[in-house]
């Protein structure tokens, strides 16, 4: 399926100079959303995944249906102050600012094979931080899946040594 026809291009969002790739049209089309989910599920099945991890918020949109289809758990990665129990944290930079990400300390057991999902790979800051959280808990990053990669931002360099699936590139 050509997923690009289901991704809207929004200039100057969330701030001037950023060209945002909006996946909500893909989510609004049940067949396209299912096809994207199915492609990631097939990728994950080859990697013997124990848990899916996704950073908020769009990583949830991708990761939850994948974890459901695989019949494995989903562990959310959230901004500081959004998870109610004991967490580990990591500072990170992203395309348009800096922030802190967290995950529950008990979200991943040592040795578990993890699939990280997110909507978009831009500069790689969010995914690099998510990898650090997973690995600090002893998880093994068995795969990383994105709907979209912005190749001109060179975020892929953060992922050397990791197995990556991207459905569409810009």
Swiss-Prot record:
A GO biological process held by the record: AMP salvage
Cited CDD domains: PRTases_typeI
Source species, domain of life: Bacteria
Pathway noted in the entry: Purine metabolism; AMP biosynthesis via salvage pathway; AMP from adenine: step 1/1
PANTHER family assigned to the protein according to its UniProt record, in alphabetical order: ADENINE PHOSPHORIBOSYLTRANSFERASE
Family affiliation: Belongs to the purine/pyrimidine phosphoribosyltransferase family.
Function: Catalyzes a salvage reaction resulting in the formation of AMP, that is energically less costly than de novo synthesis.
GO molecular function annotation: adenine binding; adenine phosphoribosyltransferase activity; AMP binding
Official protein name in the record: Adenine phosphoribosyltransferase
Origin organism lineage: Bacteria, Bacillati, Bacillota, Bacilli, Bacillales
Assembly description: Homodimer.
Record gene name: apt
Catalytic activity: AMP + diphosphate = 5-phospho-alpha-D-ribose 1-diphosphate + adenine
E.C. no: 2.4.2.7
Heme keyword on record: no
Cellular compartments per GO CC: cytoplasm
Transferase among keywords: yes
Subcellular location: Cytoplasm
InterPro entries, sorted: Ade_phspho_trans, PRibTrfase_dom, PRTase-like, UPRTase/APRTase
